Amino acid sequence: MEVGVFIPIGNNGWLISENSPQYQPSFDLNKEIAQRAEAHGLDFLLSMIKLRGFGGKTEFWEYNLESFTLMAGLASVTERIKLFATCATLLIPPAYAARMCNTIDSISHGRFGLNLITGWQRPEYSQMGMWPGDEHFARRYDMLSEYAHILRELWEKGESSFQGEFYQMEDCRVRPQPQGDMKLICAGSSDAGLAFSAKYADYAFCLGKGVNTPTAFAGNNERLAAATAKTGRDVSIYVLMMVIAAETDDEAMDKWMHYRAGVDEEAVAWLGNQGAADKTSDTTNVRQLAARESAVNLNMGTLVGSYENIARMLDEVATVPNTGGVLLVFDDFVAGVETFGTRIQPLMKTRQHTAG
């Protein structure tokens, strides 16, 4: 099973709490995380793109770096680990995105891939006059399908004359082509999102669910399997999990409860309001992000416990059919990656190939 890190491109990582570590994103922080992850044999890094945060006392995600340029920088200071940026497709035309990808492919010598998002938080785009209207919610995967088609053409052939509803190419040329096998990721969990992944993506990301329930996401894999049965493609799931680890279960749980006690209610309320804006689907992952149950960390799957129990639960993740890997976030990223590499990974049956 592959293991990657969802690096903290935004302030405070993925904990919306006054009691969690408070920090700003920086290249130096992410460089240290990237190099430690590579040294411990982890497989990939992914950075998101967030253009406006949730506010509140913690100003959650109000401070963010940009995904492509951050990953270009990290490509120059790493040697083996795979790198994925996230593309805000409402802002960046597909031909320009293809050229940026080709450039980072050159910097990284074939280690780069791209995560495509449609955009769901209206204020991110309306603040700069780029929100296409709420009808976007119903048509966003139609748009993204054209986007992905153009990317594939440009990467494979170096040119495209695709004529669609959303994009029109006229003898568009993007060269040199990438030296690596450019992989596409999508994180959509709605029926439309999974149908898109089944047709265009190489990997599909999903949110884990619950606290210490490492296989609770299995239903998402089953839904994707039904979608890929129609396309005949092999698309594996990578599941997002937060790890809060300590020497003992009690110590780890104390940290988790402390973070929960400090939840930034104002920021969580903003998330809830934005998550309710899409009226077209009940299966979108934004519904899970904004649910009240564990909004302190956007309701992602959370593994809390001793190093031994975290290792056991991560191995359980790998037992879910069609799971290709896990994408990890930590309460403290530098310490978390180091602890994972030295105390957790050596205990995992699915990571024994990294030993020594």
Swiss-Prot record:
Keywords: Flavoprotein, FMN, Monooxygenase, NADP, Oxidoreductase
Gene Ontology BP term (one): nitrogen utilization
Keyword NADP: yes
Entry annotated with the keyword Chloroplast: no
InterPro entries, per database record: Luciferase-like_dom, Luciferase-like_sf, Pyrimidine_monooxygenase_RutA, SsuD_RutA_monooxygenase
EC category name: oxidoreductase
Molecular function GO labels: alkanesulfonate monooxygenase activity; uracil oxygenase activity
Alphabetical list of Pfam families matching this protein: Bac_luciferase
Positions annotated to bind FMN: 49-50, 115, 124, 140-141, 190
Assigned EC number: 1.14.99.46
Catalytic activity: uracil + FMNH2 + NADH + O2 = (Z)-3-ureidoacrylate + FMN + NAD(+) + H2O + H(+); thymine + FMNH2 + NADH + O2 = (Z)-2-methylureidoacrylate + FMN + NAD(+) + H2O + H(+)
Function noted in UniProt: The FMN-N(5)-oxide reacts spontaneously with NADH to produce FMN. Requires the flavin reductase RutF to regenerate FMN in vivo.
Family: Belongs to the NtaA/SnaA/DszA monooxygenase family. RutA subfamily.
PANTHER family on file: ALKANESULFONATE MONOOXYGENASE, ALKANESULFONATE MONOOXYGENASE-RELATED
Protein name, as recorded: Pyrimidine monooxygenase RutA
The organism of origin for this protein: Haliangium ochraceum (strain DSM 14365 / JCM 11303 / SMP-2)
Encoding gene per record: rutA
